[in-house]
């Protein structure tokens, strides 16, 4: 039966309740950088309960809060651009969602922005196409030579790496998935800006790029000496190109 033709007054049909979807942008600081993706979700579930927000629940024998999060962050990394979609059973002001959650979330997790989006808006996870990172590299890199070394690295027609899949490992060319890479080092140390493909179609992790770059320079790669910070997750806006997941989507 076509959805538009359903008569909800008939016995056996229940008209679905209207839900309101709020996209929140939040940080993941040093205090919580070793908390994994699933634990972040549980953390939000508890915070929503404590905040007494009118969250929507799934139907069935084991109802759960309707919330989802964008691309998982590498364990040990920090971020200022994490996103989640939270469905509410009642319409409330977006600033209230942000305000009340920030009262109950732990140090290191802070809601920076909240917008009400339409049901037609792609989920945060589905919309991702790119991600921006700052990499805090170790002292093996020469700050004065770094920009030239990056340019030489990117001049390669292909950059082959061994990538793990669910079943095995395979050699993959990642060159087209590196949108930008540059030296942004300062007096505090070696820093590299990365702009990479991300999401369900193509997903390139910053640590894969850095391992490949160190190998290109014939330097030992010690992964625990390098820190990663995600600046933002990006979607492709039909009018403006790549924008943050929380930009140009709010209806209030």
Where are these predicted regions, by residue range?
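A contiguous pocket-lining binding segment that forms or flanks enzyme active sites
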Residues: 134-170
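Helix N-cap motif at beta-to-alpha junctions
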Residues: 89-94, 139-142, 199
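Ordered, amphipathic secondary-structure segments that act as subunit-interaction surfaces
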Residues: 80-134
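Short amphipathic alpha-helices in soluble, non-transmembrane regions
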Residues: 96-105, 146-154, 209-210
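Core RNA-modification/binding signature centered on pseudouridine synthases
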Residues: 1, 11, 16, 155-252
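N-terminal ordered "arm"
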Residues: 31-54
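Short, charge-patterned binding micro-sites
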Residues: 56-86
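Hydrophobic, proline/glycine-rich low-complexity stretches
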Residues: 2-26, 32
């Amino acid at each position: 039966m076509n959805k538009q033709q359903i008569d909800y007054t008939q016995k056996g049909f229940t008209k679905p309740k209207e839900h309101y979807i709020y996209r929140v942008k939040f940080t993941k600081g040093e205090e919580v950088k070793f908390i994994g993706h699933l634990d972040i979700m549980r953390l939000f579930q508890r915070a929503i309960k404590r905040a007494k927000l009118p969250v929507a629940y799934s139907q069935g024998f084991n109802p759960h809060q309707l919330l989802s999060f964008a691309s998982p962050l590498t364990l040990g990394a920090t971020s200022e651009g994490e996103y989640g979609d939270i469905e509410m059973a009642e319409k409330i002001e977006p600033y209230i969602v942000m305000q009340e959650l920030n009262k109950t979330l732990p140090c290191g997790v802070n809601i920076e922005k909240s917008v009400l989006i339409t049901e037609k808006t792609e989920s945060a996870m589905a919309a991702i196409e790119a991600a921006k990172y700052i990499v805090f590299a170790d002292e093996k890199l020469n700050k004065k030579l770094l920009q030239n070394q990056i340019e030489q690295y990117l001049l390669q027609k292909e950059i082959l790496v061994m990538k793990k899949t669910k079943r095995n490992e395979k050699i993959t060319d990642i060159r087209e998935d590196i949108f930008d890479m540059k030296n942004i080092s300062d007096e505090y140390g070696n820093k590299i800006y990365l702009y990479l493909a991300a999401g369900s179609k193509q997903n390139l992790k910053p640590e894969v790029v850095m391992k490949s770059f160190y190998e290109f320079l014939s330097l030992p790669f010690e992964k625990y000496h390098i820190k990663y910070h995600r600046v933002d997750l990006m979607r492709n806006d039909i009018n403006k190109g790549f924008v943050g997941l929380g930009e140009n989507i709010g209806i209030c």
